[in-house]
Amino acid sequence: MNNFKLCVPCLLGLEGPIADELRRMKMQNVQNENGRVYFTGGAKEIAKANINLRIGERVLLELGRFRAETFDELFEKTKALPWEMLIPRDAAFPVKGYSLNSKLFSVSDCQKIIKKAIVERLKSVYGIEWFAETAETYQIQFSIMKDVASLCIDTSGEGLHKRGYRPAHNAAPLKETMAAAMVSLSRYRGREDFCDPFCGSGTIPIEAALIAKNCAPGLKRDFSAMRWRSLDKSVWQLEREEAVSREFNGNYNIIGTDIDPTALDIARENAVRAGVSDIVRFEKADATKFDRVTENGIIVTNPPYGERIMEKQEAEQLYRLFGEAWRKTENWKLYLLSSHTEFERTFGKTADKKRKLYNGMIKCDLFMYLQ
């Protein structure tokens, strides 16, 4: 495998930060599209991206992209792709995907057509009539948007937000990839004090610690493509070793606070599993009484929305009181994620900047107060 078109799907609004990540990794031909970022590479780049990406959802290998308005078109164009380059005769190759604003809108029918086309292709190449599918898995992932089909093989397996440090969490968790995106957008690099006053199970402070230490988020997990016979397995160990060699050691002041002692216990356990318990501390504190005074600091936080945990009125009261407390501090920049359409009015101050993001299916804004 020398040069494939690779794709990182992402939540809308995060294409730019992911493209920046890939360019810092020296990836080639980085290009943004809505909800995905493309680049090119082979085995080394697949391993590097999976191990090091903080914000992307997974790494897909795109084998083909074409227009398909009929099932016949979908079948013939899928069958024409060189699936045998990657999929051995005994491998499993399940198919899943989605369709949006397309003539081929039945996902289950598209799944069957794509599966049949790949089977027919491999039957003709391998000269066999039946596939046991008992060996390693090559997950086929398709998307059909505005009648354009993209056919990929998933190299990641579980989503890249699964870092391996959070088997337990409290209610309404923030995905690790979104937490990392928020920290990255704050430009925190370990030099200032850092605080999340609504830390819950600790995802934001833990991701901040991983960024401060330049610790690759995928070091503690496996990836689907590690088991592929078509990939050089040695690249994974080499990329892990290279990632470890780039880690920093320093003195960091990273704090997570919450009023829920159970959530704090979970946060401490997660920090231990993430390998950052030595540089992150968790304390019981009321965010509405926030009073930290230092030369400079960054707050990155995701307070309750009033949509899932708290009622809207309670959330508004929380925003108002936290806003009053924050305005009494000096030199603390604030990056706060909320879906509340009247957040700035409730908080008591207009943001210097805003960025639209999606937390799961919830449309949010990242409100940036730069003081």
Each language-model region and where it sits:
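Non-catalytic nucleic-acid substrate-recognition regions in nucleic-acid-modifying enzymes
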Residues: 2-136
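Short beta-strand/turn micro-motifs composed of small residues
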Residues: 10, 258, 338
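Class I S-adenosyl-L-methionine
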Residues: 98, 145-185
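A short, flexible beta-alpha/helix-coil linker loop
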Residues: 100-103, 159, 304-308
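Conserved S-adenosyl-L-methionine
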Residues: 174-291, 307-308, 313-314
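C-terminal catalytic and target-recognition region of SAM-dependent MTase-like enzymes
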Residues: 285-371
